[in-house]
């Protein structure tokens, strides 16, 4: 059970490992782009390419989905970014239970956006957790954990791709352990949990009175959506790549330099943040130096 690109890696690994996939559950087709043409989820596209049976129930709690799951007789349910809450009746159907591929080091960052919040909070390390699913969100017993460092320049989109592959590897190892009877479950430390709520569009607006490090993490953590944004010379731009520089005596929000190296803006902690890549409204993503050719900025002396 899964929907976005993140889940494709896990499904692909199960197929490559030779497991029988009795059914693939994914969210219903959604309108996409301006034409509002219905589009398949990435999981559905991959499943159909492999000749797998795809199911897209609109509700999981009305009894129809439960009847369908029971009809399929799964030995194990695997969930990866499905985007739906599963009732206990479904979770308890398979003899081996239901497990989830979660993109954080539980109990930290339970919830919908763990990858984004790890970067927003400036974490240096993250990973994936394979856990049993329980009634409470992301609170089930842990079966397997794999860790990885977060590069200071890595954004959420790039980290998601890496964790998808790491999650697929962890899932493969976990399923083999379950099959062999060697899996060990560890109860989460519920007193240590943190929550990673859904992102909102207003989170993208840059407040230059914040520290340069905070804004740098905001830029990285909100890619590809909603993206950090700010006004430069009266025009709103999305900011995609930055780096923290040295100290300045200029007021927060002041453009201290603008040239081939990028656009340097003063932040609330007295440091500069250099904008390296941005996207103007209605335009493409580009280097800040290219943007300046058509949009010169006034630099405060």
Model regions: which residues?
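Conserved beta-strand segments of alpha/beta enzyme cores
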Residues: 20, 51-53, 97
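An anion-binding loop in the catalytic cleft
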Residues: 209-301
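Acyl-group handling in specialized metabolite and lipid biosynthesis
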Residues: 197-210
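Short beta->alpha connector loops
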Residues: 3-6, 58-61, 82-84, 245
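N-terminal glycine-/serine-/threonine-rich beta1-alpha1-beta2 phosphate-ribose binding loop
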Residues: 27, 31-75
């Amino acid at each position: 059970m899964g929907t976005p690109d993140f889940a494709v890696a896990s499904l692909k690994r199960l197929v490559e490992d030779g497991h029988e996939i009795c059914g693939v559950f994914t969210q219903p087709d959604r309108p996409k782009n301006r034409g509002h043409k219905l589009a398949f989820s990435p999981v559905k596209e991959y499943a159909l390419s492999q000749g797998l049976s795809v199911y897209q129930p609109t509700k999981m709690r009305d009894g129809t989905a439960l009847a369908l799951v029971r009809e399929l007789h799964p030995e194990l349910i695997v969930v990866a970014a499905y985007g739906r809450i599963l009732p206990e009746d479904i979770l308890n159907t398979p003899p081996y239970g239901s497990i989830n591929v979660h993109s954080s080091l539980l109990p930290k960052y339970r919830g919908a956006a763990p990858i984004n919040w790890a970067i927003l909070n400036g974490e240096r390390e993250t990973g994936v957790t394979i856990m049993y699913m329980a009634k409470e969100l992301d609170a089930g017993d842990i079966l397997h954990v794999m860790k990885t460092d977060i590069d200071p320049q890595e954004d959420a989109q790039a980290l998601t791709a890496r964790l998808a592959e790491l999650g697929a590897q962890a899932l493969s190892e976990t399923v083999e352990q379950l099959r062999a009877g060697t899996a060990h479950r560890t109860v989460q430390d519920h007193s240590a949990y943190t929550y990673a709520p859904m992102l909102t569009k207003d989170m993208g607006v840059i407040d230059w009175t914040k520290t340069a490090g905070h804004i740098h993490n905001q830029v990285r953590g909100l890619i590809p959506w909603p993206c950090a944004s700010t006004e430069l010379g009266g025009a709103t731009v999305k900011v995609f790549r930055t780096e923290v520089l040295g100290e300045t005596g200029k007021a927060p929000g002041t453009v201290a330099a603008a040239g081939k190296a990028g656009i340097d803006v003063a932040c609330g902690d007295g440091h500069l943040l250099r904008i390296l890549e941005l996207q103007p409204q209605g335009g493409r993503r580009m280097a800040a130096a290219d943007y300046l050719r058509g949009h010169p900025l006034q630099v405060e002396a």
